[in-house]
A protein has these predicted regions:
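Extracytoplasmic copper-binding redox domains, predominantly the cupredoxin/blue-copper superfamily
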Residues: 18-257
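Sec-dependent bacterial lipoprotein signal peptides
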Residues: 1-16
Length: 257
C-alpha cells in the first residue's frame, strides 16, 4: 500500500509504512555482501541520498530445507533462510529498490550500459536478491551450482521467459525491453529461490545496501517523485526538489508490525 506523498525542498524527511509480521526468521545482511549497483547519471547533477530503516519487530524469514540438495547445503555453515527481510545494524533495511518514478525531463534519453549485470545462482539462491537494470541492458544469468536450475521471469509488461541451466558454469543473457517495477525471477526446481529486478528507462535508481544506505546521482535540477519498493513492506513515494548540484537527504523508515 502506498503512503502519503511528502514534498521536500531542503534538508531531511522521514517516511513511515506499516506491515504485518509473521513467525519466520530475520535474515541479517552478510558481512561484505555485494548488492547490484545502479548506473550513475551525470557527475555534474544533484544527488538524493539516504538510509532506510524499520521500526518495531521485523518479520522473521522462513528456514530453507536444502536436505535434498547436498551440493547447495554444503555451502552453508549455518542453516540458510529466505531473504525477505535483510536487517543490518541499527535496524537498517537492505534490498529496497529506490527509483525516480516521475520528474525526469521529457524527451531525455539514456544509453544503457554495455556492462552486463550478473545474476548468479549459488547455494541454491539468487545473488543479488534485488537489483536494477536499464531497458536494453544485458542481465547475465549464471549457474554456479552443480545442480539443475531454471530461471522463470514473471513479468506483466515484459515478455516472460523460462530457461534451464542444468550444469555449473552455464551463462544465459537476457534483456528487458519495457520499464517495469518489479519483475519476479523464480526457480521452478527450488521454490524458495526468488530475485526481483527493477527495469528502468534511466539510470536514476539504487538498491539499499546492508547498512540501509542508497544514493541516486546525476539528477538535473527539478522536482522528482521517488518511490521505494520492498517485497514485504510495500511502497512509499515522496517528492524531492533538486537545485544545481546539491545533495538532498531522504531517510525512509518502514514500520514492521
Amino acid at each position: 500500500m502506498k503512503g502519503r506523498i511528502f514534498s521536500v525542498v531542503g534538508g531531511m524527511f522521514l517516511l513511515t509504512v506499516c506491515s504485518k509480521g509473521d513467525n519466520s526468521q530475520v535474515q541479517a545482511a552478510p558481512p561484505g555482501a555485494e548488492l547490484a549497483s545502479a548506473p550513475t547519471g551525470s557527475a555534474a547533477g544533484g544527488t538524493i541520498t539516504g538510509k532506510i530503516k524499520f521500526t518495531g519487530t521485523a518479520p522473521r524469514n522462513s528456514a530453507i530445507d536444502m536436505s535434498e540438495e547436498a551440493v547447495c547445503k554444503a555451502k552453508y555453515s549455518t542453516p540458510p533462510t529466505e531473504e525477505v527481510v535483510v536487517a543490518g545494524p541499527a535496524n537498517a533495511l537492505a534490498n529496497v529498490f529506490v527509483y525516480v518514478s516521475a520528474g525526469v525531463p521529457a524527451g531525455q534519453t539514456f544509453t544503457a550500459p554495455a556492462t552486463p549485470v550478473v545474476l548468479d545462482q549459488s547455494g541454491c539462491r539468487y545473488h543479488p536478491h534485488v537489483f536494477g537494470v536499464m531497458v536494453g541492458q544485458t542481465v547475465e544469468i549464471r549457474n554456479s551450482d552443480a545442480v539443475l536450475h531454471n530461471i522463470k521471469a514473471v513479468a506483466k509488461k515484459n515478455r516472460p521467459f523460462n530457461v534451464s541451466q542444468p550444469s555449473a558454469g552455464m551463462k544465459t543473457p537476457r534483456t528487458f525491453t519495457t520499464p517495469e517495477v518489479m519483475v519476479n525471477l523464480q526457480c521452478n526446481v527450488h521454490g524458495w529461490m526468488h530475485s526481483f529486478v527493477g527495469v528502468r528507462p534511466d539510470p536514476f535508481f539504487a538498491v539499499s545496501g546492508p547498512d540501509g544506505s542508497f544514493s541516486i546521482t546525476g539528477l538535473p535540477p527539478g522536482t522528482y517523485t521517488i518511490e521505494a519498493w520492498h517485497e514485504k513492506f510495500g511502497t512509499q513515494t515522496a517528492t524531492v526538489t533538486i537545485a544545481g548540484t546539491e545533495t538532498k537527504t531522504a531517510n525512509l523508515t518502514f514500520a514492521a508490525r
